[in-house]
Amino acid sequence: MVNRLRTKLIRDVRAGIWQIVAISIVAGLGVAMFYGLLMGYSNQKISYAVSYQRLRFADVTIGLKRAPRAIVQRISGMPGVIHVDGRLVVDLDVEQSPGRRGRVTGRLVTLPPRDQPAVNQLLVLEGRLPIGGARREAALESSFAARHKYRPGDRIFPKLDGQRVAFTVTGIVSSPEYIYAVQSKQLLMPTPETFGVLFVRRDQIESLLGMAGSVNEVTLVTEPGQADRIGEEIRRRYSAYGSQDPMTRAEQPSNLLLQSDLDGYAPAAVLMPTLFLGTAALAVSLVLARWVQAQRGQVGFLRASGFPPSAILQHYLELGIAAGAGGGLVGVGLGYGYGLLISKVYADLLHMPYQIVEPHPELAVAGFGLSLVACGLGALGPARQAAAMSPAEAMRGQVPSSPMLAARIPLPLMLALPLRNLLRRPLRTLGTAVGVGASTILLILTGSMLDSLDASLRTYLKEVQNYDLLVGFSEPPADGILFHFRRWPGVLRVEPSLELPVRILHNGRSEETVMIGVLPGSQLRRLPSLDTGLPMFPLPGTVLFTDALMRKLNLERGNLLNIAYTQNTREFSAEANLRSGDPVHQPIGTPIYIGLRDLQLRYGVPLGLPPRGITGALLRVEPGYLASVRARFQARKDVALVQTSDELAAQIYELTAYSRTFMGIFMLFGAAMALAVTYTATDSILWERTRELATLRTLGFGMGRISILVALENMMVAALGAAIGLYPGIRVAQGLMDATQTEGFAMKLVVSQQTYLMALAAPVVLVFLAQWPGLRRISRLDLAGAIRLRDE
């Protein structure tokens, strides 16, 4: 008995092999998404953990104004401290040799005279660490070195106390502090074009800095759970040395950005496989439901021959599981390659110190099991329906339904036949349409992600930052200096800029960011409203927040906030209580905005800035003059930063290249799923109607007319499915968008007309293509044999 059902199973699989293959492809894509995404996710988490552990990444960092190096020994004796290191960290201007960008912002980080530091050790990628002694040598952080094409033996020129000092590059290194080479929490975006880290031996630099025998930063590795307590105790104990608030590992800028990326990665790793595997289950259910109806006579015969309901149930479940097994095998192989690709792309982007790539067989097994479960669940409904049939009911066939209302409406024959077939079994038609709608959901999802990314970049680069040239000064001058720049040839407009690092306190929550002063009516820095998109300007005593920062701090319009300058000292400090205004739509970064004059009066004056002091300028320049204006600024000793809008755009596009790669792969997978789903839907309809179409051929219908009938029916189902999937697709896209917002990048959902057109038209086109294999089969039918087949 079992052998006979096994023989029938093999014959059924052979007869519907392409439908089984199509279902397996959908399931396989889901498994590939699950295995590949989670493999990449797991490898990145492990790579972070291994890099942090091997290089002793600091659990807590405390900045100091100046303290004797002897405090390092005292701190090492505190309970809970495992490793401690004291060092000098200084930001300064760095000049480069001809052929490279003229001047950048550098950060000097000192190393012990001979060995690796006890905390935040370095991995040498090329060359060696500085030796120390009489020779002035430096090792460069890898992303900065790669961007500016530094090799061991090259020279670099930091400016120490206003003097240009030559250092020889001895090595290229990777640091756990600068996996993402970000300058601070206020400037939470990697900018290797304009910011680099130089590691030098302490004995080579401390006298030049006037800091001999001193440290201004202490880093510690602590026992688990002790970082907050120890950091706060050090801050309190050494407040006489200007100790700052401790920065834990979770708050460290590079790690903050890395963890934000991982948090944004996780929802896609869950949602995308779920969508694919759910669609596979639906496809199995649709195909087997039609098979069960087409095989009612066979089921009745088997039941009459003594086969129990459990055997019938198992038989149809095995059909679904066979499709799931095929999908699982394909998906594991494809997912492994996908996981390797993700790991490689991410490693190339970040220059991870230790890149760990493991196959994670437990994920492969889980993915294979999910494929079996999804397809098994999809088969369960039709299998139970078949098992519940009594022999007499099954062999009698279905009783024709009473004439429908649509049947009484006079319609042309070529329209009446397909419409009758659709309305005769509305639930089955709806199920098929839902299968097509699933592909519409995925097409909207992937298309809208690309649309939203492009729209976000346009908003940031063309509206928020609408300048041609950004200039940052070494020391804040008064804004009167801008009158001089306005007279330069090619300069069309100059606007002042004042940016200060601040800490926001609200209802027990705090966040460090940068506060930017905005000129009323500014044309070069616009603040589009989140709700209307129209430019806004902060009222006096009010600050405008990005929508991402408002959500993080749980802010509402009108909330009172304490905003303090982060580098307050006994000599200079500034803070104010201000109210929050309406949210600004800014996709990149989380700054806050205040009126320029308001910022100068409330913060600039208390901090000792010149009257109407500024930290930079924004310029609009005629295209033919941009290079010369940039060169003039780079030649000025009072200018620390010069950046064109094209350079900013290039940095941002480089950062988003990883996301674009993901979205492109999602779109390819989505197109493959859409084709597979529409093929199963259309081909199962053709299998079900084989006898009817063969009868039409014997009545004189040519294949041309039959093709039109089939195409009309399938197009109606496809159009219904596309319409069904439209709204859920938008909701799923919005949910994924909300779940994947990161610390540095927050997009607003945008669905372009092209995406709507693609999502609506693609299922119709795919259905049209997917029906041709079935039509070719019908054109080659043995008509007499087909008509003798037992229909429903």
Task: For the regions a language model picked out, list residue spans one by one.
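Short cytosolic juxtamembrane segments of multi-pass membrane proteins
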Residues: 3, 388-404, 779-792
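Short coil/turn motifs that cap or connect alpha-helices
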Residues: 151, 308-309, 390, 556, ...
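C-terminal transmembrane helical bundles of large multi-pass transporters
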Residues: 497, 614-621, 630-733, 738, ...
